Amino acid sequence: MVDKNRTLHELSSKNFSRTPNGLIFTNDLKTVYSIFLICLDLKEKKHSSDTKSFLLTAFTKHFHFTFTYQEAIKAMGQLELKVDMNTTCINVSYNIKPSLARHLLTLFMSSKLLHTPQDRTRGEPKEKVLFQPTPKGVAVLQKYVRDIGLKTMPDILLSSFNSMKLFTFERSSVTDSIIHSDYLIHILFIKMMGAKPNVWSPTNADDPLPCLSSLLEYTNNDDTFTFEKSKPEQGWQAQIGNIDINDLERVSPLAHRFFTNPDSESHTQYYVSNAGIRLFENKTFGTSKKIVIKYTFTTKAIWQWIMDCTDIMHVKEAVSLAALFLKTGLIVPVLLQPSRTDKKKFQISRSSFFTLSKRGWDLVSWTGCKSNNIRAPNGSTIDLDFTLRGHMTVRDEKKTLDDSEGFSQDMLISSSNLNKLDYVLTDPGMRYLFRRHLEKELCVENLDVFIEIKRFLKKMTILKKLIDSKHCDKKSNTSTSKNNIVKTIDSALMKQANECLEMAYHIYSSYIMIGSPYQLNIHHNLRQNISDIMLHPHSPLSEHFPTNLYDPSPASAESAASSISSTEADTLGEPPEVSLKPSKNLSNENCSFKKQGFKHQLKEYKPAPLTLAETHSPNASVENSHTIVRYGMDNTQNDTKSVESFPATLKVLRKLYPLFEIVSNEMYRLMNNDSFQKFTQSDVYKDASALIEIQEKC
């Protein structure tokens, strides 16, 4: 039996994290959406298309895993999820007011997490209609359920709605902007175009669905040895039962020859991500002189695929990402009728046609397909080294957007440095491929915790800067205005310490604790030392202090903390400098906040974060809502307890800092000595090398 005194109950209360433009952080949206679906406990055949029972007939259509508008608003009023582990108890609760609940429902719709099966062209929520999770929404739920270690699998994960493998982006922990490089954009482009041209036709067969075993990452290995007692209720095996998780003949409920048409107004069009964007083949352009282009696609189709098949939640962010395909020279516009592509502005439209550039064609490497040539009226072909502009052709250039658009040039890694783990970890594209390799090797947690700890260390540097600023202000000034600054710094200090503790708890409960969902293979003494700190009876984690949630002053803790490391909202600036190479000098327990661990080891390369260019806040009243996201219970103690807990909190963080750094270095050693060596021998690595060679030639 687990000692109750050594069971960690982490309690905190906070608002949604927001970007500089006021948008809710992507991870917060995915979390509240997942808990929302878990609390709804959706079942099959719950609702029919006709809500009046006396009108039901044999021809009435039933929709699986649906819920009503009223059920959604009511459920969000009191969301609660409890996950019991060996030494921790995670209790997550949200109490969301109706105004914010309606706004979140709208966000879930615009993010393609929900749709209305009765009216698949509807893009906004409405009362008296049924809502249903999309394949993208189910994929988000699947990831959350696995990460948090939920013992009971939601039924929808075993259905045909579970069919999507999302492309997931890494984001800045400060601005929530996408961390990208040219190489990552190239990988995304290859995935979007598919293994072969996906030419749409009403007679096409439905896209095949991946088997559930690959989506659930489930392997029924009876040879696995463990010292723990068999507890079927803690796993998913009992739920799977007689379901054939290797079935390759599954059919998606969203498959439809009309709603998958790239010209349709369907809210959701893609239910698998590996088939590629839907193209038009041999489409004719021009008025007096007809010109036929082998493969074309619209900007609406690009945007639709990004929204359906990646974890992007905000519409304008998808537009910015789609524009990067043009910026990097992978696609070129068609400026002949019926295409209505703007010469100076990238816009999303069903009538804005593009085709692959020569560079884009080289990257996709469709086997068995001829080059994407343009056939002129006289029968001759125009190679895609040239781009159509009106009735004349000019050479295709890589630079298709001005620097004034706010896009920063990313530095490409070279093939000569590809055999170094540091460079692979630094480039978002190579890191993505390395992550996929680790997933196949069943050790992706080594990379995940390595990055999580680096973010924790970055937070600690910000905390140290705040402490230093407070001490400097106390020594130099005592005026009223300076006292206000000190109060602001105090508020920021408590918020920053709060976030550091939350990150420490997440790292511990997800990777280090015995029985955690992604338990690391580390030395027993190291695990025990961390557990002694986290589970100490007098740890401030058991009396977690709240931040001031209702302070309307502009000098809030959030603004003070974010001002330390921020980027301009209208540019693709640089992300926080989180070193992805472990420090060579380990700190001891008495030496807190050592600067050696934060030196930027690879200054010659800085991936760029993708930031939205415009503010998108359709409902101002919602933005000012005092609705609270609560983890555990409602902490409404006064600030006195917060101040009293602060020294103990810093003491815990000082003790955790060197231990987490040791874990980070150990994970780096494991990846460098084992996983990376296997990665360099894999087919994925060889393909990456070939792709980089193509980049260097372009």
Swiss-Prot record:
Origin superkingdom: Eukaryota
Q: Which residue intervals define the domain DEP in the entry?
A: 273-358
**RGS domain location:** 420-689
Matching entries from CDD domains are given as: DEP_RGS7-like (cd04450)
Q: What's the short name of a Pfam family annotated to this entry? A: RGS
Q: What is known about its processing and modification?
A: Phosphorylated by FUS3 and KSS1.
Could you tell me which InterPro entries the record lists for this protein? DEP_dom, RGS, RGS_sf, RGS_subdomain_2, WH-like_DNA-bd_sf, WH_DNA-bd_sf
Q: Which GO terms describe its cellular component?
A: plasma membrane
Keywords from the named record = Pheromone response, Phosphoprotein, Signal transduction inhibitor
Please give the record's induction comment: By exposure to pheromone.
What GO biological process terms does the UniProt entry carry, in alphabetical order? Answer: cellular response to pheromone; conjugation with cellular fusion; intracellular signal transduction; negative regulation of signal transduction; signal transduction
Q: Where is this region: Fungal-DR?
A: 10-203
Q: Which residues carry this modification: Phosphoserine?
A: S252, S408, S539, S587
Q: Where is this region: Disordered?
A: 545-586
GO MF, one example: GTPase activator activity
Other facts noted in the record for this chain: Present with 5980 molecules/cell in log phase SD medium.
Regarding domains, what does the record say? The fungal-differentiation regulator (Fungal-DR) domain is only found in fungal regulator of G-protein signaling (RGS) proteins that regulate differentiation pathways. It is required for function.
Its protein name is Protein SST2
Instruction: Name its species.
Output: Saccharomyces cerevisiae (strain ATCC 204508 / S288c) (Baker's yeast)
Write the gene name. Answer: SST2
